[in-house]
């Protein structure tokens, strides 16, 4: 896909752009966890990439601070809601900063800017005939003496009949509804059966906006799967949106309605505008340039797929009929699973961002792993903790940093820290030629493809170093000039790889820039190699391997007490650790019959009709790739496998299966503790090499 097609704006590579980017506002009622971090890492990578292109980008967010949950939690803690949200704001900001998420402004929806904008938008909607008042029946908690907000009523979904769903939307099927439509409702505050009482509420006439929304959602503003979901909701009919709540409530009072407050989902997205308005005031920016109806600036929202309804229906309609521009695009992502399952407190996989930082320390390990999984779609991604350790150690330590660690020392010791002439080099030319493809992947949020391509280039750089073996050249005085050239070429490759990885690994890139004594890298630096005689610093360790024990400690620290659970769990079979009995030993001659080869996974895809299999296309240096069916579907997404190196049995007799011919076997580890986990060779291994 070339610039100007698909998801890429026309002239994206040359014309200067002005972008306003937002991430969804985290609710100020709890800690940031690793599921939340998927979105903030994804959006931060995209923003950093755009800034490296030389575009003007403003990246804003805020805490979502209003609603009954905030009010009740503050009451429980014996503090004011304002005190609670100030404390949580500081915690959230620290978590994002330590994960290198670089907001240009991180604000709060409990601000005067947000109050003014929410009131102004409400008045504009009312003037346009889009606000109605209706007397409704609403649930009332007879124990707490309060009307119950949607999220404090639970019951059975009226559409799919899932149990324990909230009063405004079903987390199982995504349907929105009114609380009175719930089956067998109960108060989430007191547990009491609520009673119905009449009250006057304010509604946004969303049903009158359907023609506009049908056009807007099909105009390329949404991913195809999101647009299809819109079609389902249109088919069900759009309901008018209740935008008011009764006192007591922590939020903004509706200007002409004493005792009535804006529903949190009205003023929360307006918080994007308020955060930017605060930034604009501080930095002298023109607020209207980004928000007026004819704005030429681009507006992008990154969100989770669970809040698509609010951002793809309510929000654009609110903007349209109050006189503001609509988003250029809304990017929705999927959920995070850990080890193939929903995050769980009992299993220790409901992990907070702070717990990760306390145990694993380096945020860039997780930034890299998420980048290697995200492809711009709404698919869920899995954090497999063993694969996380293996991939980071293999890719970042064994491949990427390995290039510098094996060559930079010679520059310092033998050449006074000065680089030699790079000249023409086929591998460097290949690295530079990949720039447009990598840029396209980043632009379209397909960081999995970008990372895959970058690591393939790192393999080629490592192969260059291994082929020339500077450690051997250093022993031969007549090879001094060649040694200087080889190490200088390798460090130019390392510089280019650092440039490509910089949106993902900004902290590591900054350390490399200091080591190479260069200005912050931008995309324009691809064709600007370091000149002969350029002085670099002595090489210092850039990154360490992840210790699996730190990951294990993190999981243990996040486990809730399992004593009750353990009492009813049958005894697990002991995993054998004793030496293999002598009766099953094989001779070296027997082992030599097995032809184990390094294989590159050229392609991986699902097999229609197969519950456990993936179809792999394996390159082992032959004329054509081998087709192998592997029972690893439960552990791996096909996209995450493409480009990886693994180990296969190359001389296994072909086996005819109902899905086709399987021409070998990939090796994977598993036992009662988990798996399968495919094997990955160390850096330098190439397709076709024999494992001995």
From Swiss-Prot:
Protein name: Methionine--tRNA ligase
Binding site for ATP: 345
Annotated cofactor note: Binds 1 zinc ion per subunit.
Similarity annotation: Belongs to the class-I aminoacyl-tRNA synthetase family. MetG type 1 subfamily.
Function in brief: Is required not only for elongation of protein synthesis but also for the initiation of all mRNA translation through initiator tRNA(fMet) aminoacylation.
Catalytic activity: tRNA(Met) + L-methionine + ATP = L-methionyl-tRNA(Met) + AMP + diphosphate
Subcellular location: Cytoplasm
Organism, as annotated: Methylobacillus flagellatus (strain ATCC 51484 / DSM 6875 / VKM B-1610 / KT)
EC numbers: 6.1.1.10
Molecular function GO labels: ATP binding; metal ion binding; methionine-tRNA ligase activity; tRNA binding
Positions bound to Zn(2+): 157, 160, 170, 173
Keyword list, A-Z: Aminoacyl-tRNA synthetase, ATP-binding, Cytoplasm, Ligase, Metal-binding, Nucleotide-binding, Protein biosynthesis, RNA-binding, tRNA-binding, Zinc
Keyword Calcium among record annotations: no
A GO cellular-component term linked to this record: cytosol
GO terms (BP aspect): methionyl-tRNA aminoacylation
Gene3D superfamilies in the cross-refs: HUPs, Isoleucyl-tRNA Synthetase, Domain 1, Methionyl-tRNA synthetase, Zn-domain, Nucleic acid-binding proteins
Signal peptide: none
